[in-house]
Amino acid sequence: MYEVKLKVELEDKVLEVTQGTTPYDILCDYFKDRKDVISCRIDGVYSDMSSEILKDCKLELMTFEDDGARDIFWHSSAHVLGNALVNLYPDAKLVHGPPIEEGFFYDVDVTDPISSEDYEKIEEEMVKIMKKNYRFERVIKSKEELLEAYRDNPCKTHFIMKGVDKESSVYRNGDFFDMCLGPHIRSTGVIKAVKVLKNSSAYFLNDPNLKSLQRIYAITFPSKGMMDEYLKRKEEAKERDHRKIGTELDLFFFSKYSPGSCFFLPNGTTMYNTLIEFLREEYRKRGFKEVITPNIFCTQLWEESGHLQNYKENMFIIEGDTFALKPMNCPGHCVMFRHQDHSFRDLPLRLADFGVLHRNELSGTLTGLTRVRRFQQDDAHIFCTKDQVKEEIKGCLEFLSFVYGVFGFRFELVLSTRPEKYLGSVDEWDRAEKALADAMDESNMPFKINAGDGAFYGPKIDITLHDALGRRIQCATIQLDFQLPQRFELKYRDSDGQCRTPVIIHRAILGSIERMIAIILESFGKRLPFWISPRQIAIVNMGNPDYVGKVRSVLARFRLDVIDDGNTLSKRIRTAETSGYALVCVVGKKEAEANEINIRFNKSNRNIGLYELRDILDRMADEKVELDSILPIDKVSISK
C-alpha cells in the first residue's frame, strides 16, 4: 500500500513522517527524553497528542509551563474529578468542569452534601483513576445519541439543545465519558499529584433562579515536586493573606451592611490615596487629563454603548430599569468626547478617571479586596487616529513597565487577535494587530500570540503580572476599540476638513485599586515599600513629650505615630517592629539632652544609630537605597 510522506517542522528540524502519524508517535521516536511534554499544537492549534497528522505542518510540543497546555492538563484533570464523583456518588449528575486560573472545578448535581471530610476519599478515587492510565479517546456522537446518554441530566441536556447542531464529541477514559470538545492530555497517568482544595455552592448558568449545584475545586500537577512547591506557596500565601494583613495594620474591613464594598480605615485610605496620587503625578508627566464623570446614568446610555444588551446581569439597575450605576467608564468618556468638536490637532486625547464603579458580583464570589462590588480603577481612554495607535500603545507599554517596575513585578504580554465574530473589516483588523505587534517589538517587549481571542470590537494586549509568590494575575489591559466610537458617532475633522471616526484605546495599569492593594500586601507583607506605607516611622517615647514634639515637627513630612503605651522600652520597640513601621526612632532622656535621635531600620533589623536632629533628614536621604530601593526618599511625601 502506498504510504504518503509528510513534512513536519518541529523546533529546528524538518521530519519526514507517514501520513496518519500522531504527535505522540513523533515524541516517542525522536524525543524520548522529553518527559515534560503534555500537549501539542499543530499549525498553532492545540490538539490531542493522538491526533493524526494528515498534511505538512508545524508541530510544537508543549509543557506545563505553557498557559494553553496547562489549561488542557487541568481540563483533563476535571474529567478525572468528574469520573471520581460519579464512582463515589451514583446519583451524581455532572454539569460543567472547566480549567480556571489555579486548577479546575466541577459543578455537580448530587443529593448528599459534599464537605471537607469527603476531600480525602475524592483524592483517593482520583489517584486510582490516574494509576490506571486510561487513554483519553475522542468519540463523535450524534445529537440524538447525546440526548439519550444524558436523558436523566437536564443540565447537560440544556447544553446539547443549545450548543449541538448535528453531532459533537465526547471523551472517554475507561468506562467513563463526558461531553467535551477537547483537546486533552494523552492519558490519566500523565497526572501525578492531586489536591482537592475547597467546595461551595453554585447556581446553574450563574442564575439564582435555577438549580443550586455543588462545586468542587481541585488542582493537579504532572509531578509530585510541583505539588509540594505549590502547597508551600499556599502556606506562605496564608500568612500573607491581604485580609489578615489588612486587619493587623488597621487598613480596611467589610460589613454585612454592604457586601462587596470595602470600608477603608485611615491607614488604608492613606495607602489608597498614595497609589492614586502616584499615578496622578505620572499622568501629568504623560499628557493625561483627569476627568470626573457621573456614577449613575439612564439606561439609554447603556443601550447606546451595547452594555445593557451584553452586560446587564453584572449591572446594578435601579428605579424600574430607568437608571444604572456605571460598571465601567468608557461610555461616559464617549459622552464627554462627543460634547465638544475636535480636530486632528486635538488628538490624541487621553482621558483618565478614578470614578467609582459598581459590578453586581454574586455574593458567593466576593473575596476580600480581589473580588468586590464597589471599586475604583486607574482607568483611561485614549481617543486617537489610526495612524497614532502604534505610538500610543508604545506609550502605554512604557507606562506599564515603569509602574510595575516600581513594585518589582514581572509581567508577560499576549496579543489576542481577531475572533470568529468581529466588527469591522479584515484589513482594519490586520493593520490594528500589526500596530500592536510593532509597538511591542519596538519596545523590546517579547510577547505571545493568542489567536482568535481578541474582543469582538478590537484586538488587545493581555498583561499577566507575576507577584512575589509566583502567582500569575491579570490586572492591566490595553485594548483597541473600533466599535464604541461608531456606536456613539464620535467624529473629528482631519487635515482636509473631513469627518473621521477616532479609535479608542482602553487602558488600565493597576486595574482595580482595591485588587492592587491586595497584591501589594501579599507581596510585601507588613514591610511595605516606605513611600506607600501608612506606617513609615514610629517614635518610641520614653517620657520626653516636649522633645517628642520637636522630633515630630522635624519629621512632619512623613507618616508617623508615637508609641507611648507605658510598656518597657523593649516591648515598645517590639510593638513598633511587629506593627509594620519602616523606621523606629527611640526618644529618651539621653537623646533629648544631646538633641539626638536613635534610629532603627525595621526591614533589615539594623540599628542605624544616633544622629543629631538637625542632620536626620540628610541621614535619611543617605539611607534611601536601603530605606526604599523603589523610589527616592523625596517620593515619600506623595501623601501625608
Swiss-Prot record:
Highest taxon of source: Eukaryota
Subcellular locations according to the entry: Cytoplasm
Family: Belongs to the class-II aminoacyl-tRNA synthetase family.
Record key words, sorted: Aminoacyl-tRNA synthetase, ATP-binding, Cytoplasm, Ligase, Nucleotide-binding, Protein biosynthesis
The enzyme's E.C. designation: 6.1.1.3
Protein known as: Probable threonine--tRNA ligase, cytoplasmic
Keyword Transcription: no
GO process annotations (BP): threonyl-tRNA aminoacylation
Organism whose genome encodes this protein: Encephalitozoon cuniculi (strain GB-M1) (Microsporidian parasite)
Database matches in Gene3D superfamilies: 3.10.20.30, Anticodon-binding domain, Bira Bifunctional Protein, Domain 2, Threonyl-trna Synthetase, Chain A, domain 2
HAMAP family for this protein: Thr_tRNA_synth (MF_00184)
GO cellular component, one term: mitochondrion
Catalytic activity: tRNA(Thr) + L-threonine + ATP = L-threonyl-tRNA(Thr) + AMP + diphosphate + H(+)
Gene Ontology MF terms in the entry: ATP binding; threonine-tRNA ligase activity
Domain TGS: 1-63
SMART domains: tRNA_SAD
Primary enzyme class: ligase
PROSITE patterns per record: AA_TRNA_LIGASE_II (PS50862), TGS (PS51880)
Main location (coarse class): cytoplasm
Membrane-spanning parts: none
